[in-house]
Amino acid sequence: MQRHLREAAWCIGTCNGLFLTAGADVQKDRIEVSIWAWGRGLTSWLIEHIVIEGGPKRQASWDELTSLLGRTWPHVHGARLGIAKLAVDTGYQASAVYAWARGAGFAQVAPVKGVEGFNRAAPVAGPSFVDATERGRKVRRGARLWTVAVATFKSETYRYLRLAAPTDEDIAAGATAPPGFIHLPQDAEAEWIKQLVAEQLVTVTTRRGFQKLEWQKLRERNGAGLPGLRARRRLDCRSGSVVRSEVARPRGPARACARPNR
């Protein structure tokens, strides 16, 4: 992982790539959001990881998440990019997620639900229409939901993290990073990197005696008492962002690409 930190001569908050997506994970006391930039061949750049304190029962948390939809980040070539699409996990407080997504607009926001197993042929399915609640009133088929084979995207992320970065000599000769390469900024925290790779793929035996592959967390707690579950959220947020790049990759210029840096 250190090669990623060394190879990137740019800092958190600065864009590269063609467009941005984000993945949001909702928990009891916070909402975590990872913003990624995407280039050709699913090459990606971590732009920023944001922790919104307060959780889904705090309206200010949703307001802060909404504000991210209108925020822009400076591109290395001078323009400014906004989030084209944001995926938000519905595993916790789904009704609150649906209500927020309805208000924010499904054109930019997609509630997602992770499903078990590997489905490489169709890792993303939907959208399906589910009931939602708005101001205490049930809205039939009021929200759109995408189902995601998260294990497939996690495997893809780990495979991309193992790709070798081009050497200085390669770059001088005109070479670029291989398709799928994950660029991490030079000021990314070491703890964040550890949390991105906080799981491993293992073979487990089911109650019926069958074997299957399953992602399991590596780190239960660190010295500061950080639950292993929280460590997994960085990978979940990355997976959500990948989903949005797959589901609704902008055709032509990204939504905010034309905004000049004034």
PLM feature spans:
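Extracellular low-complexity, Gly/Ser/Thr-rich intrinsically disordered linkers
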Residues: 194-243
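Mg2+-dependent endonuclease catalytic cores in nucleic-acid-processing enzymes, primarily RNase H-like
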Residues: 12-13, 22, 42-208, 238, ...
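Extended hydrophobic-aromatic, low-complexity segments
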Residues: 31-34, 238-239
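Short acidic, Gly/Ser-rich segments with clustered Asp/Glu that frequently serve as metal-coordination loops
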Residues: 26-30
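Active-site proximal loops enriched in glycine and acidic residues that flank catalytic Cys/His/Asp
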Residues: 35-37, 90, 113, 217, ...
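Short conserved beta-strand segments at catalytic cores or DNA/RNA-binding microdomains
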Residues: 21-24, 34-41
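A contiguous, basic/glycine-rich beta-loop/short-helix subdomain that forms a polymer-engagement track
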Residues: 1-21
